[in-house]
Amino acid sequence: MASTWRSIHVPSRLNGKRQERLPRSRNVRPTRAIFAEEESDETVMAVLTPGDQHLPPLVEVSLKLGTMTEEIRMVKPPSVDELWSWYEMTGNMEADPSWAKNWETAMSFATAIAEGSNTDVPNLKSKRLLEVGSGLGLVGIAAAKCAGADSVVFSDREPLAIHCALSSAAVSGMNVVAVSDLSLERGGASACAGCLFDWSKPQALAAEIDVVLGADCLYDPATAALLAKCCADLVAKTKGVVCIAEPEKERAIGCRAAFLDACTAAGATTRIVPLPKASSIHPPTVLVVASWE
Protein backbone atom coordinates (compact mmCIF):
# COMPACT_ATOMS: atom_id res chain seq x y z
CA MET A 1 0.00 0.00 0.00
CA ALA A 2 1.16 3.53 -0.71
CA SER A 3 2.42 5.50 2.23
CA THR A 4 3.04 8.85 0.47
CA TRP A 5 2.25 11.83 2.68
CA ARG A 6 -0.75 13.07 0.80
CA SER A 7 -3.91 14.41 2.21
CA ILE A 8 -7.41 15.37 1.25
CA HIS A 9 -10.23 17.17 2.97
CA VAL A 10 -13.42 15.14 3.06
CA PRO A 11 -16.39 17.50 3.40
CA SER A 12 -19.00 16.55 5.96
CA ARG A 13 -22.51 15.65 5.00
CA LEU A 14 -24.57 18.87 5.05
CA ASN A 15 -28.31 19.38 4.72
CA GLY A 16 -28.85 15.74 3.84
CA LYS A 17 -26.51 15.85 0.85
CA ARG A 18 -24.04 13.04 0.30
CA GLN A 19 -20.34 13.77 0.44
CA GLU A 20 -18.54 14.78 -2.74
CA ARG A 21 -16.31 12.23 -4.44
CA LEU A 22 -12.66 12.30 -3.50
CA PRO A 23 -10.09 13.79 -5.84
CA ARG A 24 -7.39 11.36 -6.92
CA SER A 25 -4.69 13.05 -4.87
CA ARG A 26 -3.31 16.36 -3.72
CA ASN A 27 0.28 16.91 -2.69
CA VAL A 28 -0.44 18.95 0.40
CA ARG A 29 0.28 18.58 4.07
CA PRO A 30 -1.83 16.12 6.14
CA THR A 31 -5.01 17.58 7.57
CA ARG A 32 -7.94 16.46 9.64
CA ALA A 33 -10.74 14.73 7.79
CA ILE A 34 -14.45 14.74 8.49
CA PHE A 35 -16.21 11.40 8.53
CA ALA A 36 -19.90 10.60 8.88
CA GLU A 37 -21.08 13.92 10.17
CA GLU A 38 -18.56 14.29 12.97
CA GLU A 39 -14.89 15.02 13.32
CA SER A 40 -12.69 11.96 13.39
CA ASP A 41 -9.32 11.25 14.95
CA GLU A 42 -8.20 9.89 11.58
CA THR A 43 -5.70 11.72 9.39
CA VAL A 44 -5.88 10.89 5.69
CA MET A 45 -2.41 10.01 4.44
CA ALA A 46 -3.12 8.86 0.88
CA VAL A 47 -5.89 8.31 -1.63
CA LEU A 48 -5.38 4.72 -2.76
CA THR A 49 -8.14 4.47 -5.36
CA PRO A 50 -11.05 6.70 -6.42
CA GLY A 51 -13.11 3.54 -6.89
CA ASP A 52 -13.93 1.35 -9.87
CA GLN A 53 -16.26 -1.54 -10.66
CA HIS A 54 -14.34 -3.87 -8.33
CA LEU A 55 -13.24 -1.71 -5.39
CA PRO A 56 -14.88 1.26 -3.65
CA PRO A 57 -12.98 4.49 -3.03
CA LEU A 58 -10.24 3.72 -0.51
CA VAL A 59 -7.93 5.89 1.55
CA GLU A 60 -5.08 5.16 3.92
CA VAL A 61 -5.49 6.85 7.28
CA SER A 62 -3.51 7.03 10.49
CA LEU A 63 -4.94 7.27 13.98
CA LYS A 64 -3.75 7.17 17.56
CA LEU A 65 -5.50 5.31 20.34
CA GLY A 66 -5.57 6.93 23.75
CA THR A 67 -2.14 7.71 25.14
CA MET A 68 -0.17 5.52 22.73
CA THR A 69 2.42 7.40 20.67
CA GLU A 70 2.65 4.97 17.77
CA GLU A 71 0.09 5.41 15.01
CA ILE A 72 -2.09 2.70 13.53
CA ARG A 73 -2.45 2.73 9.75
CA MET A 74 -5.75 1.64 8.24
CA VAL A 75 -7.21 1.17 4.76
CA LYS A 76 -10.88 2.09 4.50
CA PRO A 77 -13.54 3.89 2.48
CA PRO A 78 -13.41 7.62 3.20
CA SER A 79 -16.89 7.58 4.73
CA VAL A 80 -20.12 5.61 5.04
CA ASP A 81 -21.77 8.00 2.57
CA GLU A 82 -18.96 7.57 0.05
CA LEU A 83 -19.26 3.79 0.25
CA TRP A 84 -23.04 3.97 -0.13
CA SER A 85 -22.62 6.13 -3.25
CA TRP A 86 -20.34 3.43 -4.67
CA TYR A 87 -22.85 0.71 -3.82
CA GLU A 88 -25.52 2.74 -5.64
CA MET A 89 -23.25 3.22 -8.64
CA THR A 90 -22.53 -0.51 -8.88
CA GLY A 91 -26.18 -1.50 -8.39
CA ASN A 92 -25.68 -3.14 -5.00
CA MET A 93 -28.67 -1.56 -3.29
CA GLU A 94 -29.03 -4.26 -0.61
CA ALA A 95 -25.54 -3.71 0.81
CA ASP A 96 -24.92 -2.28 4.27
CA PRO A 97 -22.23 0.45 4.18
CA SER A 98 -21.96 0.82 7.97
CA TRP A 99 -18.70 -1.16 8.09
CA ALA A 100 -16.86 1.79 6.49
CA LYS A 101 -16.48 3.67 9.80
CA ASN A 102 -14.49 3.09 12.96
CA TRP A 103 -17.44 3.48 15.30
CA GLU A 104 -17.18 4.91 18.79
CA THR A 105 -17.64 1.57 20.57
CA ALA A 106 -14.79 -0.01 18.61
CA MET A 107 -12.63 3.04 19.32
CA SER A 108 -13.22 2.74 23.07
CA PHE A 109 -12.50 -1.01 23.08
CA ALA A 110 -9.41 -0.64 20.90
CA THR A 111 -8.13 2.16 23.13
CA ALA A 112 -8.57 0.03 26.26
CA ILE A 113 -6.66 -2.80 24.55
CA ALA A 114 -3.88 -0.50 23.33
CA GLU A 115 -3.33 1.19 26.70
CA GLY A 116 -3.35 -2.14 28.54
CA SER A 117 -4.26 -0.61 31.89
CA ASN A 118 -7.82 -1.92 32.22
CA THR A 119 -7.80 -5.13 34.25
CA ASP A 120 -11.28 -6.03 32.99
CA VAL A 121 -9.84 -6.55 29.49
CA PRO A 122 -8.21 -10.00 29.38
CA ASN A 123 -4.49 -10.35 28.77
CA LEU A 124 -4.21 -10.90 25.01
CA LYS A 125 -0.46 -11.48 24.82
CA SER A 126 0.34 -14.63 22.79
CA LYS A 127 -3.39 -15.41 22.46
CA ARG A 128 -5.14 -16.61 19.31
CA LEU A 129 -7.97 -14.20 18.62
CA LEU A 130 -10.99 -13.88 16.38
CA GLU A 131 -12.81 -10.59 15.88
CA VAL A 132 -16.44 -11.35 15.11
CA GLY A 133 -18.31 -8.91 12.88
CA SER A 134 -14.95 -7.24 12.45
CA GLY A 135 -15.81 -4.58 9.90
CA LEU A 136 -12.59 -2.58 9.45
CA GLY A 137 -10.87 -4.68 12.12
CA LEU A 138 -9.75 -1.88 14.45
CA VAL A 139 -10.17 -3.97 17.61
CA GLY A 140 -8.20 -6.89 16.20
CA ILE A 141 -5.45 -4.66 14.84
CA ALA A 142 -5.07 -2.99 18.24
CA ALA A 143 -4.79 -6.44 19.83
CA ALA A 144 -2.14 -7.54 17.34
CA LYS A 145 -0.09 -4.36 17.23
CA CYS A 146 -0.37 -3.13 20.81
CA ALA A 147 -1.24 -6.15 22.99
CA GLY A 148 1.04 -8.81 21.51
CA ALA A 149 -1.62 -11.24 20.29
CA ASP A 150 -0.19 -14.29 18.55
CA SER A 151 -2.78 -14.17 15.76
CA VAL A 152 -6.02 -12.49 14.77
CA VAL A 153 -8.75 -13.73 12.44
CA PHE A 154 -10.99 -10.99 11.06
CA SER A 155 -14.44 -12.44 10.42
CA ASP A 156 -17.32 -10.70 8.72
CA ARG A 157 -20.03 -11.45 6.16
CA GLU A 158 -18.86 -8.54 3.97
CA PRO A 159 -15.86 -9.51 1.77
CA LEU A 160 -14.79 -5.90 1.22
CA ALA A 161 -14.61 -5.33 4.98
CA ILE A 162 -12.22 -8.27 5.30
CA HIS A 163 -10.20 -6.92 2.36
CA CYS A 164 -9.80 -3.61 4.20
CA ALA A 165 -9.01 -5.26 7.55
CA LEU A 166 -6.25 -7.39 6.04
CA SER A 167 -4.88 -4.44 4.06
CA SER A 168 -4.79 -2.46 7.31
CA ALA A 169 -2.99 -5.31 9.06
CA ALA A 170 -0.39 -5.31 6.29
CA VAL A 171 0.29 -1.55 6.37
CA SER A 172 0.42 -1.72 10.19
CA GLY A 173 3.23 -4.28 10.01
CA MET A 174 1.37 -7.54 10.62
CA ASN A 175 1.95 -10.81 8.75
CA VAL A 176 -1.07 -11.59 6.55
CA VAL A 177 -1.59 -15.33 6.07
CA ALA A 178 -4.30 -17.87 5.28
CA VAL A 179 -6.38 -19.20 8.18
CA SER A 180 -4.92 -22.66 7.56
CA ASP A 181 -1.39 -21.26 8.06
CA LEU A 182 -1.98 -19.62 11.44
CA SER A 183 -0.51 -22.58 13.30
CA LEU A 184 2.79 -22.51 11.39
CA GLU A 185 5.96 -21.46 13.18
CA ARG A 186 6.95 -17.87 12.45
CA GLY A 187 8.83 -15.04 14.07
CA GLY A 188 8.22 -11.33 14.45
CA ALA A 189 4.84 -9.66 14.14
CA SER A 190 1.43 -11.17 14.82
CA ALA A 191 -0.26 -13.14 12.04
CA CYS A 192 -3.59 -11.95 10.66
CA ALA A 193 -6.07 -13.85 8.51
CA GLY A 194 -9.61 -13.27 7.31
CA CYS A 195 -12.69 -15.36 6.69
CA LEU A 196 -16.28 -14.88 5.61
CA PHE A 197 -18.37 -15.72 8.64
CA ASP A 198 -22.09 -15.49 9.34
CA TRP A 199 -22.90 -16.27 12.96
CA SER A 200 -26.51 -17.11 12.08
CA LYS A 201 -25.30 -20.26 10.31
CA PRO A 202 -23.36 -23.17 11.88
CA GLN A 203 -19.75 -23.02 10.71
CA ALA A 204 -16.40 -24.49 11.62
CA LEU A 205 -13.08 -22.66 11.62
CA ALA A 206 -9.75 -24.25 10.73
CA ALA A 207 -7.99 -22.59 13.67
CA GLU A 208 -8.17 -22.77 17.45
CA ILE A 209 -9.33 -19.58 19.18
CA ASP A 210 -8.54 -18.46 22.74
CA VAL A 211 -10.44 -15.17 22.78
CA VAL A 212 -13.32 -13.82 20.70
CA LEU A 213 -13.49 -10.04 20.45
CA GLY A 214 -16.26 -7.89 18.99
CA ALA A 215 -17.81 -4.44 18.99
CA ASP A 216 -21.35 -3.33 18.14
CA CYS A 217 -22.53 -6.89 17.51
CA LEU A 218 -25.69 -6.92 19.64
CA TYR A 219 -28.24 -5.13 17.49
CA ASP A 220 -30.88 -7.79 16.78
CA PRO A 221 -32.63 -9.74 19.57
CA ALA A 222 -33.43 -12.48 17.06
CA THR A 223 -29.74 -13.25 16.43
CA ALA A 224 -28.20 -12.48 19.85
CA ALA A 225 -28.52 -16.09 21.03
CA LEU A 226 -27.08 -17.31 17.71
CA LEU A 227 -24.05 -15.08 18.22
CA ALA A 228 -23.62 -16.50 21.73
CA LYS A 229 -23.71 -20.07 20.41
CA CYS A 230 -21.24 -19.19 17.67
CA CYS A 231 -18.84 -17.67 20.21
CA ALA A 232 -19.23 -20.64 22.57
CA ASP A 233 -18.40 -23.04 19.73
CA LEU A 234 -15.33 -21.02 18.73
CA VAL A 235 -13.76 -21.21 22.21
CA ALA A 236 -15.08 -24.67 23.16
CA LYS A 237 -11.74 -26.47 22.69
CA THR A 238 -9.67 -23.87 24.49
CA LYS A 239 -12.19 -22.95 27.22
CA GLY A 240 -11.63 -19.35 26.28
CA VAL A 241 -13.19 -15.93 26.74
CA VAL A 242 -15.60 -13.80 24.72
CA CYS A 243 -15.53 -9.98 25.02
CA ILE A 244 -18.11 -7.90 23.18
CA ALA A 245 -18.04 -4.10 23.53
CA GLU A 246 -21.41 -2.38 23.32
CA PRO A 247 -22.90 1.06 23.96
CA GLU A 248 -24.03 1.28 27.56
CA LYS A 249 -27.48 2.24 26.28
CA GLU A 250 -28.75 -0.69 24.24
CA ARG A 251 -29.78 0.04 20.68
CA ALA A 252 -32.26 -2.83 20.80
CA ILE A 253 -33.69 -3.71 24.21
CA GLY A 254 -33.28 -7.38 25.06
CA CYS A 255 -30.19 -8.11 22.94
CA ARG A 256 -27.76 -8.07 25.84
CA ALA A 257 -29.95 -10.24 28.07
CA ALA A 258 -30.52 -12.76 25.27
CA PHE A 259 -26.77 -12.97 24.62
CA LEU A 260 -25.88 -13.37 28.30
CA ASP A 261 -28.62 -15.94 28.91
CA ALA A 262 -27.42 -18.04 25.98
CA CYS A 263 -23.79 -17.84 27.16
CA THR A 264 -24.82 -18.88 30.68
CA ALA A 265 -26.82 -21.80 29.27
CA ALA A 266 -23.67 -22.86 27.40
CA GLY A 267 -21.72 -23.02 30.67
CA ALA A 268 -20.10 -19.59 30.82
CA THR A 269 -19.76 -17.18 33.70
CA THR A 270 -20.72 -13.68 32.61
CA ARG A 271 -20.28 -10.09 33.71
CA ILE A 272 -20.68 -6.56 32.37
CA VAL A 273 -18.00 -3.95 33.08
CA PRO A 274 -17.67 -0.30 32.01
CA LEU A 275 -14.96 0.79 29.58
CA PRO A 276 -13.33 4.23 29.66
CA LYS A 277 -14.51 6.49 26.86
CA ALA A 278 -12.01 6.94 24.02
CA SER A 279 -12.80 10.67 24.08
CA SER A 280 -15.19 13.08 25.74
CA ILE A 281 -17.55 13.04 22.74
CA HIS A 282 -17.97 9.27 22.77
CA PRO A 283 -20.97 7.72 24.55
CA PRO A 284 -20.39 5.36 27.52
CA THR A 285 -19.35 1.83 26.53
CA VAL A 286 -19.54 -1.47 28.40
CA LEU A 287 -17.73 -4.76 27.90
CA VAL A 288 -19.89 -7.88 27.92
CA VAL A 289 -17.67 -10.77 29.04
CA ALA A 290 -18.41 -14.50 28.92
CA SER A 291 -15.75 -16.88 30.19
CA TRP A 292 -15.43 -20.65 29.93
CA GLU A 293 -12.07 -20.67 31.75
Describe the role of every protein-language-model region.
Residues 2-293:
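S-adenosylmethionine-dependent methyltransferases
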